[in-house]
Amino acid sequence: MRYNQFSYIPTSLERAAEELKELGFDLDLQKTAKANLESFLRKLFFHYPDSDYPLSHLIAKNDMDALSFFQSEQELSKEVFDLLALQVLGFIPGVDFTEADAFLDKLAFPIHFDETEIIKHIHHLLATRCKSGMTLIDDLVSQGMLTMDNDYHFFNGKSLATFDTSQLIREVVYVEAPLDTDQDGQLDLIKVNIIRPQSQKPLPTLMTPSPYHQGINEVANDKKLYRMEKELVVKKRRQITVEDRDFIPLETQPCKLPIGQNLESFSYINSYSLNDYFLARGFANIYVSGVGTAGSTGFMTSGDYAQIESFKAVIDWLNGRATAYTSHSKNHQVRADWANGLVCTTGKSYLGTMSTGLATTGVDGLAMIIAESAISSWYNYYRENGLVCSPGGYPGEDLDVLTELTYSRNLLAGDYLRHNDRYQELLNQQSQALDRQSGDYNQFWHDRNYLKNAHQIKCDVVYTHGLQDWNVKPRQVYEIFNALPSTINKHLFLHQGEHVYMHNWQSIDFRESMNALLCQKLLGLANDFSLPEMIWQDNTCPQNWQERKVFGTSTIKELDLGQELLLIDNHYGEDEFKAYGKDFRAFKAALFEGKANQALVDILLEEDLPINGEIVLQLKVKSSENKGLLSAQILDYGKKKRLGDLPIALTQSSIDNGQNFSREPLKELPFREDSYRVISKGFMNLQNRNNLSSIETIPNNKWMTVRLPLQPTIYHLEKGDTLRVILYTTDFEHTVRDNSNYALTIDLSQSQLIVPIASN
């Protein structure tokens, strides 16, 4: 374990003493440091009628237990404080450590003993993570140190778990959206699942916009998947034009219906544990699946601003600007009289994507988004540089396939009976509009590109993204983060994992940082919390997070690739082609081992190479035919210890998100030896070699200069490392699988790898 503590708010002595007193700690500025520490420790054992017993189970020195120490005349020293602090946080002498000083250095322990600062040390200790993954104060509250009185209690600028999660209100409302996406002449209704504490205080809301939450249709999804085996089409030379079109909602009328009291209820919905954490701290949770999902009406428009509007309508309702009904019969309306109107959205992948889309509307009431692994341009999710390009792990998927997966109205037999014919018509229109044949950008994709509206974002923004996420690739967050207005508060956590959540990782206090931010933004707490704009997980060692100023630098280093002419054959033998098509993982293994069709260049680094931004391959290339696709991957190659990309569970249920509520495992990325690490990758149709909107011809056997931008990253390579460049054509995971008989030739003497370099 290593501390990377970003959430602690430096506190004055007077404020620290006041907050400790509010928690019931009997500390006195006139007492000695030793007496105050003893009083603090005894309070920790509030379950015991006699605190001597648990105190005797701690050691103050290697030869003295804590009870004996406090009964002695010995003075409090750094050695004693450190040893007791470690034990209070759950670290066991002789098991987790033998030498406390060395262990504290390894932990990067954030508290440095000064006898005159004991009150502040105790305050800081309570806000510090235990071995279990919870802060000490959260651990104590979870054990019942504070009663669940359904009111707010704060410590170090963060809300504590004092809301009763055993008596939650679970209710359903149906919000009227200014849409008619299925064109049936009726405004669409949006189902909203609400979970909130029983409190007299107006509550802020965490909203998870999740098209998955009302169920998914995996059978329809699998039937809709496309075969990747097809020839790369030769496109006609042309210029692509699109236009920015404002989304115009339909008119709605003020509702004059009586207020209803009897709301639909529910017993369970699959929740997000970060939401659960905040539910216990006085934040209502709502789950919304939007148009075209079970319980709602309309068509699944998948990514456009009509879908976004269906979530926006819910924020409007929370602020009194839209109508919600108690049921589909629309006999009674219901108002969000429990809400304070301020909303933060949460969730990963599609969920985070909807958060980004919502933010670009500038809707009043949306105070903050926490968007994890989020898409900012749907074209860049299903296409790349004029190519059909599947997200990592999902060959054959496209946006209409996702529509089939998430159009959960068809899971309700009655809805299927009444609406499936119309749904199939609209789905067919969507399939035609996305143009899987060419892979080109068009108006359909432009209408699903949130980057063009990034300037309208006015809420606070928190993004998390994995630099090993080849599903929602790093370009998605790179482009939206760098497009955000300079006037807003923005934060980015870049980790070394893949498409995963990070709120329950041991090495970073993400939950607590979000708590401090949300208390600021949604509860109006003046806590003086300041979070760095960008925090990056160091790839060279375990559990080390660093502040960074920018994602993408203008300083570059050009690396020569060699002097040879290298030939890349596109064609595989029939058996090999079929084998790779059945198992793209076998293809990846062969590719990285130098066995698949490829041109391979290894560069031994003579100095450190701190990459920050978008690597570009500038290549001199020619094709034997009038078509060609180019794929590239950059590897950190050779056996050494690296971070894994999937977090593993260190404990099974040590994190309590409330008071015995929604327990979850503590996780972390492992650090272990492997043979290589993908740093970046990229794909291009050579007919789109100059830009996305220009379709050009490929002259047979004529040299072309190609600039292939790869996925942005921050990655530190060290002197002596090997940077492996792999150039090839068909990628069996991502691209169409064209087995036609053509070849590319690369002139390495006229080619370079252009690397953005991080400044010191």
UniProtKB/Swiss-Prot annotation:
Annotated GO biological process: proteolysis
InterPro entries: AB_hydrolase_fold, Galactose-bd-like_sf, Pept_S15_Xpro, PepX_N_dom, PepX_N_dom_sf, Xaa-Pro-like_dom, Xaa-Pro_dipept_C, Xaa-Pro_dipeptidyl-ppase/CocE
Broad EC category: hydrolase
Pfam families associated with the record: Peptidase_S15 (PF02129), PepX_C (PF08530), PepX_N (PF09168)
GO cellular component terms, semicolon-separated: cytoplasm
Active-site residues, record numbering mapped to chain: S349 (charge relay system), D469 (charge relay system), H499 (charge relay system)
EC number: 3.4.14.11
Keywords attached to this entry: Aminopeptidase, Cytoplasm, Hydrolase, Protease, Serine protease
Highest taxon listed in the record's lineage: Bacteria
Reactions catalysed: Hydrolyzes Xaa-Pro-|- bonds to release unblocked, N-terminal dipeptides from substrates including Ala-Pro-|-p-nitroanilide and (sequentially) Tyr-Pro-|-Phe-Pro-|-Gly-Pro-|-Ile
Classification via SMART domains: PepX_C (SM00939), PepX_N (SM00940)
Molecular functions per Gene Ontology: aminopeptidase activity; dipeptidyl-peptidase activity; serine-type peptidase activity
Record's subcellular location: Cytoplasm
NCBIfam families noted in UniProt: PRK05371.1-4 (NF003783)
HAMAP family tied to this protein: Aminopeptidase_S15
Family from the record: Belongs to the peptidase S15 family.
Subunit structure: Homodimer.
Record's function text: Removes N-terminal dipeptides sequentially from polypeptides having unsubstituted N-termini provided that the penultimate residue is proline.
Protein name, entry field: Xaa-Pro dipeptidyl-peptidase
Native source species: Streptococcus pyogenes serotype M2 (strain MGAS10270)
Gene that this sequence comes from: pepX
